[in-house]
Design a protein with these regions (language model features):
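Surface-exposed assembly/interface segments
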Residues: 1-390
Length: 390
C-alpha cells in the first residue's frame, strides 16, 4: 500500500489527463438476402457473415435470389466491410417475408434480420447501413427500422409495390422513424443472368453509395446528388427540373421520398428521412446524432468505476471538447461544446456515484434550397463614354 512504512523510493503512476476519442466506424453495410444456390459454407443460412471483398464474394453467391445482385450493386459503388445474412427463399412472398423478418429460436439463436443484432458479438463489427434489397415489403421495412434503432444504424427502404408518384407518397405515411430513408422508383441495369435489362434495386445501390460517401466525404454528407455507378436507366418516369419545384421529384422530396434523376449520370435526389421530428428532418442529422452517441459513449468506458474526483470530470469534459473541436475543424459539425451542470450534480447525486456531463452540437445542414437573386440594372452604363475614350 502507498501509505505503508517504507525506507526507500516508490513510484506511483498517476494516469490522469484527457483521452483521445476515436470516431466509431460508420461505413459498415448490413443486409439480408435470398440466394438458395449460394455457397452454403460461405453463406450459411440465418448467420451473419463478414465480407471484406464484396466483388469476390459475389462469385460464390449463386444466381438466384437477391444475394449476388446486391453484392454486385454494392461493389459497383465501393468495397465496404459488409455483413450478410442469407435466408431461404419461401414458396410464397409471405413465407419469404417471414424468413427475412426472422425470430429467436428456443435455443436463443437469432434468425433473419435479427441475426444482424449478433454481428458485433460474433464478428466484432456493428452494421450501420442497412437494407433488404428486393424484399423490403412494408412488414419487412417496419421490422428493419426497429433493428436500425437497436443498432443505431440507418435503413434504406424502397416504396415497395408502388407504381406511381402518388402511391409512393401515400406509402411514406406508414413510417415515422428517423432511422430510415424511403426511395422510389428503382434503377434499371443489365442483368448478366437474364441477358437483358432488368430492375436494379435502388436500395442496394444506396447501401454501397452510402458507404462510399462515408469513406470519401464523411457521414455529414447526405446520399443526394452523387453519381451512381452500374445503372443504365430508371424504372419509372420521374419529371425533374433543377429550377422548378412543381415536378414529380419536387413533390416526392416535399413528402420525404428520395427519388432518382438523370443528370450527368444517374443520382439519388433527396436528403430527407422518415422522421416525424423536424429536428431530424435530414438523413445526415440522424446519422450525426448516432455517430456522436456511440463515439462519446464508447470512448468513456475507461472512466467507469474510476474514483469520482473533480479531476476525472475535468478530463472527461476536456476530452469531449477536444473531439468537438476536431470534428468542427474537419467540417463534420458546425459547432459543439461540453460542460458540467452544477444543478444536476448535487451532493446526493455525486454521493450515489452518478455524474452527468452535458454536451451539445450543431449538425451540418445540406444545401437543399439555393436561392440566387438576379437583378437588372443600368449602372454599368454610367461610365460608358469614358470607357470608350480609354
Amino acid at each position: 500500500m502507498a501509505q505503508d512504512y517504507h525506507h526507500g523510493v516508490r513510484v506511483v503512476e498517476v494516469n490522469e489527463g484527457t483521452r483521445s476519442i476515436t470516431t466509431v466506424s460508420t461505413a459498415i453495410v448490413g443486409m439480408v438476402c435470398t440466394g438458395d444456390d449460394a455457397d452454403a459454407k460461405m453463406f450459411p443460412l440465418n448467420k451473419p457473415v463478414l465480407i471484406t471483398d464484396v466483388l469476390t464474394a459475389s462469385g460464390k453467391a449463386g444466381e438466384s435470389g437477391t444475394l449476388a445482385r446486391s453484392l454486385d450493386a454494392i461493389a459497383d459503388q465501393a468495397k465496404p466491410v459488409t455483413v450478410v445474412v442469407r435466408v431461404p427463399q419461401g414458396e410464397t412472398e409471405e413465407e419469404t417475408t417471414t424468413n427475412i423478418i426472422g425470430a429467436v429460436t428456443a435455443e436463443g439463436k437469432k434468425t433473419g434480420m435479427k441475426a444482424l443484432l449478433s454481428a458485433q458479438s460474433q464478428l466484432g463489427v456493428k452494421p450501420r447501413i442497412l437494407g433488404v434489397p428486393g424484399h423490403d415489403t412494408k412488414a419487412v421495412a417496419t421490422e428493419l427500422l426497429s433493428v436500425a434503432q437497436s443498432l443505431r444504424g440507418f435503413a434504406y427502404l424502397s416504396a415497395y409495390g408502388c407504381k406511381t408518384v402518388q402511391e409512393a407518397i401515400t406509402y411514406r405515411e406508414n413510417f415515422s422513424q428517423r432511422e430510415g430513408m424511403l426511395i422510389w422508383p428503382d434503377f434499371t441495369g443489365w442483368d448478366t443472368v437474364l441477358n437483358a435489362e432488368a430492375t436494379a434495386y435502388a436500395t442496394a445501390r444506396a447501401l454501397g453509395l452510402r458507404a462510399k460517401i462515408d469513406e470519401q466525404n464523411g457521414w455529414h454528407k447526405s446520399l443526394s446528388n452523387v453519381g451512381v455507378n452500374g445503372v443504365t436507366g430508371i424504372s419509372a418516369d420521374v419529371f425533374w427540373d433543377l429550377q422548378d419545384p412543381a415536378t414529380d421529384a419536387g413533390l416526392l422530396n416535399q413528402n420525404d421520398v428520395t427519388t432518382l434523376i438523370r443528370k450527368d449520370g444517374f443520382r439519388f435526389w433527396g436528403s430527407r428521412c422518415l422522421s416525424d421530428d423536424p429536428l431530424f428532418a435530414f438523413e445526415n442529422y440522424t446519422r450525426t446524432a448516432q455517430v456522436l452517441t456511440d463515439t462519446m459513449a464508447e470512448a468513456h468506458m475507461w472512466a467507469v468505476d474510476k474514483p469520482l474526483n473533480p479531476s476525472l470530470a475535468r478530463d472527461i469534459i476536456e476530452g469531449i471538447r477536444a473531439k468537438m473541436r476536431s470534428l468542427v475543424s474537419q467540417g463534420y459539425l458546425i459547432g459543439g461544446d461540453c460542460w458540467l451542470d452544477e444543478s444536476v450534480n448535487d451532493k446526493d447525486t455525486l454521493k450515489a456515484g452518478k455524474l452527468t456531463i452535458d454536451y451539445d452540437y450543431t449538425p451540418v445542414p445540406p444545401l437543399e434550397n439555393l436561392m440566387l437573386r438576379q437583378r437588372i440594372t443600368d449602372q454599368y452604363l454610367v461610365n460608358f463614354s469614358s470607357q470608350v475614350s480609354a
